[in-house]
Amino acid sequence: MIQKPRGTRDFLPDEMEARRSIEAKMREAVRRFGYREVCTPEFEELELFTLRSGEGIMQEMYVFEDKGGRKLALRPEITAAVIRMYINEAKVAPKPLRWCYFADCFRYERPQKGRYRQFWQFGAELIGADTALADAEVIMLAAEALNATGVTWELKVGHLAFMKNLLADLDPAAQRRVMAHLDKKDFEGLAETLAGMRKSGLNDSLTALVECRTLAEAFEIAGTIPEKERVEQTMGILDASGVRYSLNFGIARGLDYYTGMVFEGFAENLGAENQILGGGAYRLAHLFGGDDVASCGFAIGFDRVMVSLGEVFAAKDTIAGIVCTDEGRSFALSVAREFRAAGIRAEMDLMGRGLGAQLAHASKTADFAVVIGKREADAGQVTLKNLHSGEQKTLDPAAAIAEVKAHGAR
């Protein structure tokens, strides 16, 4: 028996409907901010991802060569592809661009709960705005999208200017080593690394910055930074907008990627793999041959959101099972067409069952049975049976449709 590839999943109808219902809530949340959906190819030129992340990322990617000898990769994330699309298709479009996406990505890593080789991201990119209000809007947008799902989570917001100010005397390689320790909260390893660099004096400042939770503390620890007013404005806008967050100036990922504001979101019940949101301000376009445009965005790990939510019950459509005899089939086909035109799911028997067997099947799969025999067909009517209450009525098709719709509205 052929099995699905490791790290992938099948979604049966109930789960798929639950996923679509949560996805729809997120889409509606970002739509209200004016963000419009875009779509990029599932595979891109390999260079799109190695330019920013280096050749090492190839170990985590699905890479292949096509028949023309081109090196391609299944996308491991969406942001780079969206910026590539901006350069190719929308460089002269009026700014800012408010784009969102929902798409699957692929990474070759060890599968575990909340981590898959094929996974879905919901995200947004704001391209061409470089203000405190732009930073704040993207954070508010991410918060609205996650709050719409009903997931229980916490938002942490920081700014890399503080960390960069403390690490200014270190070369990029040394900065990455320090940030790796901070990312893992490995303070013992941090102290050893700084001692080896003869920078032990930084240890107390870095540890204090990671642990501080107010702007005043952060400014006191890191000293004067050029972005002081911008940071204060961003946090002020978030406060005025009622966004619930905590400050975290120890966010240590992406020091060589993000340019300023950064934020992360964590679900309360996912254990070690609890990050469901990551985002911040960045500049990527110039790496891909475009202008040096300011951008800000985020990605939500949709699969982890679904795991955190647990069992989700999507609203179910009312289903009408069309039950008919051979003599009533022509009229039944017409009635089914009317039900569907009215937006009601109508299912006909395809198995050649008798009337009793059709009713038995409908009782397991439908809310109403629309029974049509020769008598009903001759009279242009149907016998509508509520399969939950057992109540049945003889009605014309329009009245039956109204009855079923009224049930669905309750």
UniProtKB/Swiss-Prot annotation:
GO BP of this protein: histidyl-tRNA aminoacylation; L-histidine biosynthetic process
Keyword Nucleotidyltransferase: no
Catalytic reaction annotation: tRNA(His) + L-histidine + ATP = L-histidyl-tRNA(His) + AMP + diphosphate + H(+)
Keyword Acetylation found: no
Family matches, as SUPFAM superfamilies: Class II aaRS ABD-related, Class II aaRS and biotin synthetases
Gene3D superfamilies tied to this protein: Anticodon-binding domain (3.40.50.800), Bira Bifunctional Protein, Domain 2 (3.30.930.10)
Keyword terms: Aminoacyl-tRNA synthetase, ATP-binding, Cytoplasm, Ligase, Nucleotide-binding, Protein biosynthesis
Coiled coil (UniProt feature): none
EC number(s) recorded for this UniProt protein: 6.1.1.21
Disulfide-bond pairs as recorded: none
Any one GO MF annotation of this record: ATP binding
GO terms under cellular component: cytoplasm
Entry's family note: Belongs to the class-II aminoacyl-tRNA synthetase family.
Protein name, entry field: Histidine--tRNA ligase
